[in-house]
Amino acid sequence: MVSQSIGWGDSPVDLCEGSNRAFQDTDQPACQLDVRLLRHKASWINPLCVQQPLQELCPQRPTVQSSENHVVLDTPSPLRLSILSYRDSLAEMPLSENTADVICSNSAHCSGGKEGDFFLATEEQEVHLQQESLLKNPKTVATSPSPKEGSARSESPHLTASTDDGDARSSSRSHAWNFFPLETFMLPADVEKENLHFYAADIIISVIENMKCNLPNQQQPERWDTEDASRLRGTGAEMTFYTHIKQEPGSSASSHTGCEGCAALQVSPVAETLSYCPVAGEACKHDLNKLVMLELGKYNDITKGCRCSYNSSKSATCESNLSPAGCLARELFRGFCKCWMLSEVNCQLPGSPTTASSGVGDEEYAEEDFDSSVDAAREVMLKSRVPGTEDWVLPRCQIILTVHPPIKRDIAVVAQNFFCAGCGTPIQPKFVKRLRYCEYLGKYFCASCHSSAESCIPARILTMWDFRKYQVSDFSKWLLDSVWHQPVFKLLGGHHSLYAKAKELDRVKDLQEQLFHIKKLLKTCRFADSVLKEFEQVPSHLTDECHIFSMDDFLRTKKGLLAPLLKDILRASLAHVDSCELCQGKGFICEFCQSTTVIFPFQTTTCRRCAACRACFHKQCFQSSRCPRCARIIARRQHLESLPTAAT
């Protein structure tokens, strides 16, 4: 592996004492690796305060650069001692154990003086080399030396240090390390910033590896032990989320998914381990979504019988007169009930007493459980209530205009077949007294469908003008609130007698008739825009049609709020008609008395309209048998019939 380091010319000079020692080959074990060689890209910058003492105290020595096969020495120069910048002396060199030992031994054996002068750059050359390094490729600057340096260097095939005087080497090296301050061996801020991405990459990689290690442990459920696995093989059933992996020597592990419920596991003396299979888990979830009822191969015939009965019931249901929604609800209900009851056979825990028993006992228990489940499913289906059946019908949104006669609770519940009228829940006879009566529907509801809400009953208002509030079910409360402001009550038919019982309603009826006729007249006048805006104070159905009211209109009439408002609108309309020439020109003249006073249809107190020709006359003058306008219409029709046709 290749690591990056700097030339020995840039490193601090070790102050060594003693006689000069030549470099020679030796088999002595390598010395301790220098800490500076352990870094990926190390560089040392001596502060200015240390450079001057180094020029005076440090001896001259060659700069050593080693590779796998050779070591490069920088020849000396008689220039002033100076420390080269780390930017100009960076060099790439492959490190190995031998070369690292050689470099360490060389640094320990070095001495000054008699070996020769070293190549040292002056401060001016330092600045010049730094400027040139900015213009060059960093990789080129780091790997290729300058021509001058190349000419001054010589290569030697092998460079080793002698093994003598080990104590002297250690003492000189410790003296050299203690001489420099701690700031000398600290990396500058620029180098730390350059190496910041290495630290970030290491942190990210460690976090990702921890997540990969913890993720399978979180997803994998609790495994069964070997004893539970053997019990599971005895029962002949398999859990879908696990696979059996047989580990045999000399053979690859083979897996059996177990998605097929009828497949029996092979028992072998080789130890088997249970492992989680994501493919099998997805297949099992897919099967559960499709409502797989039973996966025991031994009960295929029973399952087929259940499917046949289910298909027959399905066809019978579809042939009935139920709505598509009701038919679908019934089919889904039956399918869910059958799936829920039959799935209990497959959901037996491996550590239960049933699975721990013999295989024959398990089969008998499964058969009994299956039969009881089928019977229970049939019983639930028979007792279940689905909207549209004969014994229970869901309440419908309808307006009931008749008052229900009083009836005993027991008789009413029997008429409901002991079912709640709202949800169809079966009611036992001992709980009949807990049911609540709905005055609107005239039926009994359970506590979940009847929260004792109160509302006015439309039938009691139309028949007895009764605005008292009675308890109704939640469904009836919602229905009455939804139609409270809708004009759905017409009093012209069977409830016309209500005008005689409610005098205030009769006055509202008269005002409504006048406003109905005068509004038609005002719509034809182009000067009646301001008056028509007054009609917006009341609902439009009160002035567009007669004898049509809503529940809110009845209540406001009962409180005396509607009649004064209608009178104000009528007063403003009459004032406009009296002063408007266009409206006066659209009035009538009584043909019986030949009076010049203009009369209008909205004057219901003094005028009357002919039912045939819709002409307006005074009440005391009008005679239906002698209507002059009807007589003219009949005479004109007879005259047209007596005229000869164009063909004759």
Swiss-Prot record:
Composition bias, Polar residues: 131-146, 157-173
Protein name: Protein associated with UVRAG as autophagy enhancer
Disulphide-bridged cysteine pairs: none
Disruption phenotype: Mice display an increase in the ratio of liver to body weight and significantly lower total ketone bodies in the serum and liver after 24 hours of fasting. Conditional deletion in the liver results in impaired autophagy flux, glycogen and lipid accumulation and liver fibrosis.
Membrane topology note: Peripheral membrane protein
Subcellular localization, as worded in the UniProt entry: Cytoplasmic vesicle, Autophagosome membrane
Membrane spanning stretches: none
Annotated region (Disordered), positions in chain: 131-173
Keywords, ordered alphabetically: Acetylation, Autophagy, Cytoplasmic vesicle, Lipid metabolism, Lipid-binding, Membrane, Phosphoprotein
Modified residues (Phosphoserine): 144
UniProt superkingdom: Eukaryota
PTM remark: Phosphorylated by MTOR at Ser-144 under nutrient-rich conditions. Phosphorylation prevents acetylation by KAT5/TIP60 and impairs RUBCNL/PACER function and autophagosome maturation. Under autophagy induction, Phosphorylation by MTOR is repressed, enabling acetylation by KAT5/TIP60. Acetylated by KAT5/TIP60 under autophagy induction, promoting autophagosome maturation and lipid metabolism. Acetylation is prevented by phosphorylation by MTOR. Lys-469 and Lys-559 constitute the key sites for tuning function in autophagy.
Organism (species): Mus musculus
Signal peptide span: none
Region feature (Interaction with UVRAG): 183-222
